[in-house]
Every structure is written in structure tokens, then in C-alpha cells.
């Protein structure tokens, strides 16, 4: 799953390419 790209603010802990 990719539920850690976009977590309200932008990034959680995994990715940071979808800010």
C-alpha cells in the first residue's frame, strides 16, 4: 500500500516526493 505519501501535511515517514 502507499498510504504514507500523502498524510494531510505532505509526508509521514516513507516518501517525500508528493509534497
From Swiss-Prot:
On the 2D-gel the determined pI of this unknown protein is: 6.5, its MW is: 33.2 kDa. This is Unknown protein NF037 from 2D-PAGE. The lineage of its organism: Eukaryota, Discoba, Heterolobosea, Tetramitia, Eutetramitia.
Amino acid at each position: 500500500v502507499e498510504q504514507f505519501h500523502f498524510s494531510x501535511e505532505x509526508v509521514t515517514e516513507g516518501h517525500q516526493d508528493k509534497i
